[in-house]
UniProtKB/Swiss-Prot annotation:
This is BCL2/adenovirus E1B 19 kDa protein-interacting protein 2. InterPro entries: Bcl2-/adenovirus-E1B, CRAL-TRIO_dom, CRAL-TRIO_dom_sf. It is found in: Cytoplasm; Cytoplasm, Perinuclear region. Keywords: Apoptosis, Cytoplasm, Phosphoprotein. One of its GO terms (cellular component) is nuclear envelope. The modification Phosphothreonine is found at residue 87. It comes from the Eukaryota. The gene is BNIP2. The keyword Isomerase does not apply. The modification Phosphoserine is found at residues 41, 77, 89, 92, 114. Implicated in the suppression of cell death. Interacts with the BCL-2 and adenovirus E1B 19 kDa proteins. The lineage of its organism: Eukaryota, Metazoa, Chordata, Craniata, Vertebrata.
Length: 314
């Protein structure tokens, strides 16, 4: 029996005979109602009313004889007035809630969600502010804008002897004063800058010319800072350092080195040398590319003048 789904409750002993076929049931219904009772176009008081479509009984089978949606009842599309059908319009109230929502203006959306444009000038300025230096096996960022006034603290003084034996000039007079509100931040970035620059300047052996003149106590780096610099220097750089020349050594720096001598290796202590004027420095180092600040030259003239006065009196 096609098109009929039998359920368990139907298979009962109360049904002594088999259920009738679907075709006989449909024929009985048509005989009772008659074809004139089928829905069609009606006229009331001579006025044509809209035709109402009766929903057919939908069967879950695909058999055309069951009155499913595939039956011939819906094939009579020619008798239906499509213009007269009451269909929902495009502006139906079903979606009116969307229109009631406040719609922000395009400019407002752009203003709230937009990101400030990064101009080429700002990108260039940001690139100048931050610079990467490699110290040992790690890369460190240095705030170049913060240390801009103090970058002259380290410079390249040319070469000496044969080969690429570099002369590195360290001018303490360009150090920041300890009274600066951001002194620790400055010294931290300056430390990275000095060590990173030293890595770039040195290829083989090198010497450091430490210009100590014209330096107040406020600009003197602490012992911990100097020790940190020495400890952070790569082993290759510590080994290749041939000489540390201190020009115009003050009583403070000489006392400091004397106190720390027991904690410094004997090899490093042998590399330290004091020079009391620029003329003596010129005998040890080629001065062609060594940049001497004006304040150092002025201090040197004052010190040499005081030393020459007793000789002139004699």
């Amino acid at each position: 029996m096609e098109g009929v789904e039998l359920k368990e409750e139907w298979q009962d002993e109360d049904f002594p005979i088999p259920l009738p076929e679907d075709d006989s049931i449909e024929a009985d219904i048509l005989a009772i109602t008659g074809p004139e009772d089928q829905p069609g176009s009606l006229e009331v008081n001579g006025n044509k009313v809209r035709k109402k479509l009766m929903a057919p009984d939908i069967s879950l089978t695909l058999d055309p004889s069951d009155g499913s949606v595939l039956s011939d009842d819906l094939d009579e599309s020619g008798e239906i007035d499509l213009d007269g059908l009451d269909t929902p319009s495009e502006n139906s109230n079903e979606f009116e809630w969307e229109d009631d929502l406040p719609k922000p203006k395009t400019t407002e959306v752009i203003r709230k969600g937009s990101i400030t444009e990064y101009t080429a000038a700002e990108e260039k300025e940001d690139g100048r502010r931050w610079r990467m230096f490699r110290i040992g096996e790690q890369d460190h960022r240095v705030d170049m804008k913060a240390i801009e006034p103090y970058k002259k603290v380290i410079s390249h003084g040319g070469y000496y002897g044969d080969g690429l034996n570099a002369i590195v000039v360290f001018a303490v007079c360009f150090m920041p004063e300890s009274s600066q509100p951001n002194y620790r931040y400055l010294m931290d970035n300056l430390f990275k800058y000095v060590i990173g620059t030293l890595e770039l300047l040195v290829a083989e052996n090198y010497m450091i010319v430490y210009l100590n003149g014209a330096t107040t106590r406020r600009k003197m780096p602490s012992l911990g800072w100097l020790r940190k610099c020495y400890q952070q220097i790569d082993r290759r750089l510590r080994k290749n350092l041939k000489s540390l020349i201190i020009v115009h050594p003050s009583w403070f720096i000489r006392t400091l080195l004397a106190v720390t001598r027991p904690f410094i290796s004997s090899k490093f202590s042998q590399k330290i040398r004091y020079v009391f004027n620029l003329a003596e420095l010129a005998e040890l180092v080629p001065m062609e590319y060594v940049g001497i600040p004006e304040c150092i030259k002025q201090v040197d003239q004052e010190l040499n003048g005081k030393q020459d006065e007793p000789k002139n009196e004699q």
